[in-house]
Amino acid sequence: MNYTTQMDAAKKGIVTKEMEIVAKKENMNVKDLMELVSKGKVAIPANKNHKSLDPEGIGQGLRTKINVNLGISKDCYNIDMELEKVQKAIDMKAEAIMDLSCFGKTEEFRKRLIDMSPAIIGTVPIYDAVGFYDKELKDITSEEFLKVAEKHAENGADFLTIHVGMNRKTAATFKKNPRRMNIVSRGGSLLYAWMELNNKENPFYEGFDKLLDICEKYDVTLSLGDACRPGCIEDSTDASQIEELIALGELTKRAWERNVQVIIEGPGHMTLDEIETNMKIEKKLCHGAPFYVLGPIVTDIAPGYDHITSAIGGAIAATHGADFLCYVTPAEHLRLPNLDDMKEGIIASKIAAHAADLAKGVKGARDWDNAMAKARRDLDWERMFELSIDEEKARRYREESKAKSKDSCTMCGKMCAVRNMNRVTEGKDLNMLRDDD
C-alpha cells in the first residue's frame, strides 16, 4: 500500500476500495468523490484494523448520515445489553455507532463492538482514561492520555472524538463569559477539570502532533469535539463556542497537512433562528470540513421528547450544511436509553436526515418518496409497508384498526379521496353504500 490514509490516497490520485464502495452507494463518480476527500470536504472514516467495516462517506453532496450512541456506565454495566443495542443499530442501518463507555475496563466491549459492526465506529478516549489506569483524573499524565487514544486506534476505532479545541485560550474565554449551563460536554468538562487541577495546557492540544501520528498510522479520522457546545438555548452562539470553533479551524488545517481526515462536532442546544447561521459559521471557520451535530435541540422544555426537539433541529441543520447527525432518544437528559428508546431515536434522526436530503437535492433522495406516492395512489398497502421507515409500526397500526373496505383505512372509509379519484378517473361507480368493495 503506497498511501497512509484515505486523504493521502486521494491527494495522490489513488482510488481506494473504500472510495469505490462509497461512490457506488452515493451514485456518484468515484473521481469526483476522490477530489472531495483530497480537499477534506468528505471524510471516509476507515481504520485499517476495522476489518468488518462497510465504509460510508460523510460530507459535501452526500446523503446525511446518522450516528447512534451507546456504551457502558457505572449504573448500567451490562455488556450483553449494549451488544443488543449494537445489533439493533446495525439492523436499523445506522451508518455510525459511538461507544461512549465511561466506567471500568472497556476494551473487551469495544473490541467486540468493532469486530461485529459494519458501521463506522467512533470512541471518546478520555472517557476511558480513569478506568484504563485506575487513577484519579488529575493524576493521569499527558502521555498517558495519548496512550489511551492510541489503544482505541489500535483496537480499530474509525474516528476518535477528542476535544482539542478546549485549550488555555478557550478556557480563558469561558471564564470571562459566564454561562447558564457551564460546560455540558462530558469530555470537555473532564479536560477542563484536568487543566484546572494541574494548571497545564490541554494534553491533546499540546501533543497534537503526536495525536496526528496516531491517526495517520491507523488511518483514524479525527472528530474534533466541541467542549463548549451550548447546553441550553441561552448559551448558544456565545464567545466560548466561537472561540473554540476558531481553534478547531486552525487544527483542521494542521491535520489536513498530515493527511488526517477531520470531522467537526457542533451544537448542541439553540433556537431555530440560529441554526442556519451556525452551520455557515462552521463551514467558513473550518474550511468546509464535514459537520457533525448533536441535534441541535431547539427547546429545553421537553424531557422525554428530545428525539423530536432534536429531529426538528437536525433537519434544519442538515438542510443548511450539517453532514452527520448524532441521534437523540426520548431518554436524553433522563437516563441511559433502552432498546425502545434507541428505535425511536434512530427513526427520528433518519427522518430528519432524509428530509434534509430532499431539501438539499441529494441525488436519488426523492426516489423513495416518489415510490411511496405511487404505492399510495395505487392503494398498494403491502408496498406502502415495505417503503415505510418503520415497517413494523405501519403494519401494526393498520392491523389494529381494520377497515371494512380493503382499499381504504378507518380514517375515511369509502370517502377516501385516493380511492374515489381512482374510481372516477377509471370510469367506475363509487359504491359508497355497499361493503362488498
Curated annotation (Swiss-Prot):
Encoding gene per record: thiC
Q: For this entry, list what GO says about its biological process.
A: thiamine biosynthetic process; thiamine diphosphate biosynthetic process
Know the name of this protein? Answer: Phosphomethylpyrimidine synthase
The cofactors it requires, by name, are: [4Fe-4S] cluster
Q: Which Gene3D superfamilies match?
A: 6.10.250.620, Radical SAM ThiC family, central domain
Q: Recite the UniProt cofactor note for this protein.
A: Binds 1 [4Fe-4S] cluster per subunit. The cluster is coordinated with 3 cysteines and an exchangeable S-adenosyl-L-methionine.
What domain of life? Answer: Bacteria
Taxonomic lineage: Bacteria, Bacillati, Bacillota, Clostridia, Eubacteriales
Matches recorded under PANTHER family: PHOSPHOMETHYLPYRIMIDINE SYNTHASE, CHLOROPLASTIC (PTHR30557:SF1), THIAMINE BIOSYNTHESIS PROTEIN THIC (PTHR30557)
Q: Where does [4Fe-4S] cluster bind?
A: 409, 412, 416
Q: Which UniProt keywords apply?
A: 4Fe-4S, Iron, Iron-sulfur, Lyase, Metal-binding, S-adenosyl-L-methionine, Thiamine biosynthesis, Zinc
